[in-house]
Amino acid sequence: MKFSKMFIPTTKETPNDATLPSHQYLVRGGFIAQTGAGIYDFMPLGKIVLEKIRAIVKEEMDEAGANEVQFGFVTPLTLWQESGRATTMGAEMLRFKDRKNGEFVLSPTNEEAVVNMVKNRITSYKDLPLHLYQINTKFRDEARPRFGLMRGREFLMKDGYSFHSSEEDLVREFNLMETTYKKIYTKLGLDFRVVAADSGAIGGSGSKEFHVIADSGEDTLVVCDSCDYGANIEAAIRKPKTYSFERKSDSKKIHTPNTKTIEEVANFLNISKEQTIKAVIKKAIYEEKTQIVIFFVRGSDELEETKACNAVNALELIDASEDDIKEAGLVAGYCGLFNLPSNINFIIDLELKDEIGLACGANEEDYHLVNTDLSTLKDVKYYDLIAVQEGDICACCGGKLSYTKGIEAGHIFQLGTKYSSAMNANFLDENGKAKPFIMGCYGIGVSRLVAAVIEQNHDDKGCIWTKATAPFMVDIIVSNSKKEEEAKVGEELYSKLKQAGISTILDDRINARFGFKMSDFELLGFPYAVVIGKKLEDGLVEIVDRKTLEKIDVKVDEVISKILELVK
């Protein structure tokens, strides 16, 4: 392709709302253009990158034995009502009515659609397993779309769904998809990490996320420095911390005026934060009600809200207001485990089970209890509630845990029978008994990967595409296209590189200065440039490595062999 024939509207102007490098460079480089909040068009270079990523995803999915299909972007609301997600998906699911008043949805995901496709068409265990996938547009009406392609409302996604007759076969496919995804991200040239994850609104039991490692990542990952353990902080675990506090006397109430924070309590009582219990009061949001819930964790720990939300099966947790707390009969700053109002739901962190000698609120203004004994509590619920901290010990190997940032670019789930049961999608087993399909779900954010590549690979000048994702491998830059000899050599090298199977763009723009062409090369991020300029008089051209910006002089007749060597 020739630059003069291609629509590549580069600009020096950075969008006002673009804070991430990928957003800035993809817009400035003419890869994408915003048409609305969280909605982007892909221009020629962006479309090439998108299709390259799509092709790699498709190749590996097909190799794994999955069947490609295509679901309608628009689905009837009745499917979502059948599964029960018409209400639980919330405002992110965009609904509309047609001229006949029929209710429809712009699909944010396709569990319902795939169950509807397979239901009554696969009826026997003999026809299982089955894996269907698509690479198609999705729409989620994000409240705050931002970061360009990273968190848009409309996006391209690969979503796959598998159907099984046994849990064992689901696990086999789940593991196969983990291997397949690793192949995809490796082919794309990305540094990534597979981590344990929370299943979120999709549901199911086991799930893993695939994160592209980048400082700008929205997700905090907990990783071990000694083994392969990794988890999203929402699902991370640590080796339990143990303490041996003495219970010097029976529990007693101590006057602790104006000591509402953990630090104030610890200082007043002359104990460590580890010897205190923190009460976090939340309002749990359910489909048809709200409820005050208290989560108790050690004073030195922090509550992990996703874990807490899962512990009470809520749609969402929000901070309880002062009025909420008073109305529930609680005392802010002095809330404790003992003598709570009987109607209050509370959950205790697992690491506090049967602990003794700790201090907590006395549920009375200006008073705390000391020397408590949690083993005396009856019929209480314990749950892993804490957010793992850097320096905690790995539960797998005893190594140190640390944080890193990641961009979620893939997620795989063991769904079980959640959707098949809800939608009455069954098969006949070996004994002729009807059973719901056991399902898996596997997603990759294809358009998000376009941005993720750049978040991991850029400098202060622009994009640095990996070899697998670059729109063109080589940019031939003719320093002065008005000079006949330079233009001629440019055309010859362009033709030879194409014949050698190297994707190449020829910057033949007559009215663009050399400095402008080089700036575009650095912004657009093609892996290599071949610069034809003054050195041509000596039979030489320059090859520039975009990643390092190193330049080497190469004889004109050796350019092809050198490029072939570099792109291996």
From Swiss-Prot:
UniProt keyword Aminoacyl-tRNA synthetase, yes or no: yes
EC supergroup of this enzyme: ligase
Gene Ontology terms, MF aspect: aminoacyl-tRNA deacylase activity; ATP binding; proline-tRNA ligase activity
Keyword terms, alphabetized: Aminoacyl-tRNA synthetase, ATP-binding, Cytoplasm, Ligase, Nucleotide-binding, Protein biosynthesis
RNA-binding keyword on record: no
EC numbers for this chain: 6.1.1.15
Catalytic activity field: tRNA(Pro) + L-proline + ATP = L-prolyl-tRNA(Pro) + AMP + diphosphate
CDD domains linked to this entry: ProRS-INS (cd04334), ProRS_anticodon_short (cd00861), ProRS_core_prok (cd00779)
Pfam families per the UniProt record, alphabetical: HGTP_anticodon, tRNA-synt_2b, tRNA_edit
Gene Ontology process terms (BP): prolyl-tRNA aminoacylation
Main location: cytoplasm
Xref: InterPro entries: aa-tRNA-synt_IIb, aa-tRNA-synth_II, aa-tRNA-synth_II/BPL/LPL, Anticodon-bd, Anticodon-bd_dom_sf, Pro-tRNA-ligase_IIa, Pro-tRNA-synth_IIa_bac-type, Pro-tRNA-Synthase_IIa_type1
GO CC, alphabetical: cytosol
Protein's cellular compartments: Cytoplasm
Recorded family membership: Belongs to the class-II aminoacyl-tRNA synthetase family. ProS type 1 subfamily.
Matching NCBIfam families: PRK09194.1, proS_fam_II
Subunit structure: Homodimer.
Function field: Catalyzes the attachment of proline to tRNA(Pro) in a two-step reaction: proline is first activated by ATP to form Pro-AMP and then transferred to the acceptor end of tRNA(Pro). As ProRS can inadvertently accommodate and process non-cognate amino acids such as alanine and cysteine, to avoid such errors it has two additional distinct editing activities against alanine. One activity is designated as 'pretransfer' editing and involves the tRNA(Pro)-independent hydrolysis of activated Ala-AMP.
UniProt comment concerning the protein's domains: Consists of three domains: the N-terminal catalytic domain, the editing domain and the C-terminal anticodon-binding domain.
Stored HAMAP family: Pro_tRNA_synth_type1
Name this polypeptide is given: Proline--tRNA ligase
Organism annotation: Aliarcobacter butzleri (strain RM4018)
